[in-house]
């Protein structure tokens, strides 16, 4: 039977519940347990697919095409277990499910209410499909006290009573702020947060306390006394240099042992931490460094590129180098020469994005990389802009563009439905729904034998995750290839371009998919490992 760990947050948001859940899962895995992590998001959106990156950060896409919270990326990277649609639920999805059931008459005329109908739907989500796991970790989004989170907290309170005794543990993540004027850490915010949680009917078993410095024993005893938690269960969560240091830090503080003890499980033997220690050692003792320019449009919020950042660091791990990131807003290149920004970097990465803003800047970044022989990695939108750049400057199609930006006579990039569906042209209404209208999830691709990208993968058959509405128009394939841009990867039916590259360039690759979503610290994605390797070579030239 699965045991359940419910992780809540208090005082402020963005304390790192997702990292805490992922780190605990990694520690339990290191002891040989089978672990699943689920995220319960209180917002009313059905999923984050149509939310602004500035509001929500990255949308993490799973193999089965779910658009989910970025925390699921942490779960995958720390545990190696692919997430799926059933690992993330939102209030919006819950309400939609309930309304559909009500319309079908499933409730037999009953008045539909938050309790029991909404809470039952949440509980069903938490309990479903856990037969093959020893532990199920459930992260509750938001902060205790938020009105949106109340149904979720009520649901996990009920589960504490309904599950067999000894199979549910509650962890509360809080903040102990340091007040410089007083020269001390303050326990009062945590006390009030726990008081709020207890008023709901949830008594935390473990306090995980974020702080920027060591918490004195006297303050731990104080928290233990006023929050009614064992002193050994007041665990400090100090700031660390990288997220990959967190499992080691939490193990040293005894989090995994305390969780097992709370379940009545002997915490011996110790977990095997070898691979985490190796990752930490490589991060803290690099043998060199490279600088990668990220030419994007959401650079004001780094969480919009969370998986991308981590995948670049993984590429650094594979090559034992530190990866420095130079963030450049693409729009800058529309009014300024890219050269001063790009001539000293060792690689240029143009990530995915939506809309016309910054597109011309990304095209100029691709042009600079092509002409100056600087390693270039174009992902999704970055591949599309590289193809438009080639069409304009190598093929001579001056007005080459994308239908994403408006009507154009030369749609080098467009909705695939605009040129092909069977053999019929299809139009999508510009005012139609955006949600659920993209190519999402894992799709196979066939790579050309002998191409650079096939050599990097070590295979001609791959499967990668997608998230896009627009594709490079296959009608331009022949002209672009004649100009030197090789379409090295296509969908198995030969209809949709998946990868492009310049054979005469040291490293210039564009991919329509998102390889960053499948990179892990212990298994860096081969494209990122190769890109950083090319950047190391470039660093010897500049």
UniProtKB/Swiss-Prot annotation:
Q: Which residues bind ATP?
A: 14-19, 71
Give the keywords, sorted: ATP-binding, Glutamine amidotransferase, Ligase, Magnesium, Metal-binding, Nucleotide-binding, Pyrimidine biosynthesis
The active site is formed by: 380, 514, 516
Q: Where does UTP bind?
A: 13, 186-191, 222
What controls how active this protein is?
Allosterically activated by GTP, when glutamine is the substrate; GTP has no effect on the reaction when ammonia is the substrate. The allosteric effector GTP functions by stabilizing the protein conformation that binds the tetrahedral intermediate(s) formed during glutamine hydrolysis. Inhibited by the product CTP, via allosteric rather than competitive inhibition.
Domain Glutamine amidotransferase type-1, residue spans: 291-541
Q: Hey, which pathway is this one from?
A: Pyrimidine metabolism; CTP biosynthesis via de novo pathway; CTP from UDP: step 2/2
Q: Identify the residues that bind Mg(2+).
A: 71, 139
Name of the gene encoding the protein in the UniProt record: pyrG
Provide the species name. Answer: Brucella anthropi (strain ATCC 49188 / DSM 6882 / CCUG 24695 / JCM 21032 / LMG 3331 / NBRC 15819 / NCTC 12168 / Alc 37)
> What's the subunit arrangement here?
Homotetramer.
Q: Which family does it belong to?
A: Belongs to the CTP synthase family.
Pfam families this protein is in? CTP_synth_N (PF06418), GATase (PF00117)
Q: Name one GO cellular component term.
A: cytosol
| Enzyme class, first EC level, given as a word | ligase
Chain segments carrying region Amidoligase domain? 1-265
| Entry annotated with the keyword Protein transport | no
Q: What is this protein called?
A: CTP synthase
């Amino acid at each position: 039977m699965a045991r359940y760990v419910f992780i809540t947050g208090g005082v402020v948001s963005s304390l790192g519940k997702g990292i805490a859940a992922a780190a605990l899962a990694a520690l339990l895995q290191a002891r040989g347990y089978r672990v699943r992590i689920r995220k319960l998001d209180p917002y009313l959106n059905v999923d984050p697919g149509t939310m602004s990156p500035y509001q929500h950060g990255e949308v993490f896409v799973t193999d089965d095409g779910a658009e989910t919270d970025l925390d699921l990326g942490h779960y995958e990277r720390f545990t190696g277990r692919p997430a799926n649609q059933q690992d993330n639920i939102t209030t919006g999805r819950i309400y939609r499910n309930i309304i559909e059931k009500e319309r079908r008459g499933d409730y037999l005329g009953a008045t539909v209410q938050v309790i029991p109908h909404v809470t039952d739907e949440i509980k069903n989500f938490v309990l479903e499909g856990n037969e093959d796991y020893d532990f199920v970790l459930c992260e509750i989004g938001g902060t205790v006290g938020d009105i949106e989170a109340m149904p979720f907290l009520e649901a996990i309170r009920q589960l504490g009573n309904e599950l067999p005794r000894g199979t549910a543990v509650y962890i509360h993540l809080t903040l102990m702020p340091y007040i410089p004027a007083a020269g001390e850490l303050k326990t009062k915010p945590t006390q009030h947060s726990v008081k709020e949680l207890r008023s709901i009917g949830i008594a935390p078993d473990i306090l995980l306390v974020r702080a920027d410095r060591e918490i004195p024993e006297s303050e731990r005893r104080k928290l233990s006394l006023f929050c009614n938690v064992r002193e050994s269960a007041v665990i400090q969560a100090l700031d660390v240099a990288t997220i990959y240091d967190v499992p080691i830090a939490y193990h040293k503080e005894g989090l995994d042992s305390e969780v097992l003890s709370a379940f009545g499980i002997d915490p011996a033997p110790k977990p095997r931490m070898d691979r985490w220690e190796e990752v930490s050692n490589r991060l803290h003792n690099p043998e060199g460094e490279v600088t990668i320019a990220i030419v994007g449009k959401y650079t004001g919020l780094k969480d919009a590129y969370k998986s991308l950042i981590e995948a670049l660091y993984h590429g650094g791990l594979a090559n034992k180098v530190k990866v420095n990131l130079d963030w450049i807003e693409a729009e800058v290149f529309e009014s300024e020469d890219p050269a001063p920004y790009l001539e000293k970097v060792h690689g240029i990465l143009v990530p995915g994005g939506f809309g016309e803003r910054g597109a011309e800047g990304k095209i100029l970044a691709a042009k600079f990389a092509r002409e100056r022989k600087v390693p270039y990695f174009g992902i999704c939108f970055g591949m599309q802009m590289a193809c438009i750049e080639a069409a304009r400057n190598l093929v001579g199609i001056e007005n080459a563009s994308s239908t994403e930006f408006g009507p154009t006579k030369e749609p080098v990039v467009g909705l695939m439905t605009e040129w092909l569906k069977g053999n019929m042209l299809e139009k999508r209404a510009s005012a139609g729904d955006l949600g659920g209208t993209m190519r999402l999830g894992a799709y196979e691709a066939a790579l050309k034998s002998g191409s650079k990208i096939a050599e990097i993968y070590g295979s001609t058959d791959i499967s990668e995750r997608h998230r896009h509405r627009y594709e490079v128009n296959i009608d331009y394939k022949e002209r672009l290839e004649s100009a030197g841009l090789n379409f090295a990867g296509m969908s198995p039916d030969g209809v949709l371009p998946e990868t492009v590259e310049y054979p005469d360039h040291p490293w210039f690759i564009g991919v329509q998919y998102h390889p960053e979503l499948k990179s892990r610290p212990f298994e860096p994605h081969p494209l990122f490992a190769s890109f950083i390797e090319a950047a190391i070579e470039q660093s010897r030239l500049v």
